[in-house]
């Protein structure tokens, strides 16, 4: 029997966050959240900062981006590249798991 280790971030299902709530959750100023949206690091629903609603995916990405911004002092374009690469790695890992399951069924 093989053991498989699965890693991930647990995100509770909750109602969407407003910009100030997201700002508090990731410990960044509101202006930095706006900059994240401008660089498409996170994509809220709504047309302006006062109407933006951030879902759990935005919260997860904002937490990662905040860590890169604060801890590693990476600028927004650099964070965008890093998040894109992390998304691609996650996608490839999912495909690999699917292929491994298919291979094990044979």
UniProtKB/Swiss-Prot annotation:
Disulfide bridge partners, by residue number: none
UniProt cross-references to InterPro entries, sorted A to Z: CbpM (IPR022835)
Transmembrane annotation, as ranges: none
A matching Pfam family: MerR_2
HAMAP family, sorted: CbpM
Family designation: Belongs to the CbpM family.
Record's function text: Interacts with CbpA and inhibits both the DnaJ-like co-chaperone activity and the DNA binding activity of CbpA. Together with CbpA, modulates the activity of the DnaK chaperone system. Does not inhibit the co-chaperone activity of DnaJ.
Protein name as annotated: Chaperone modulatory protein CbpM
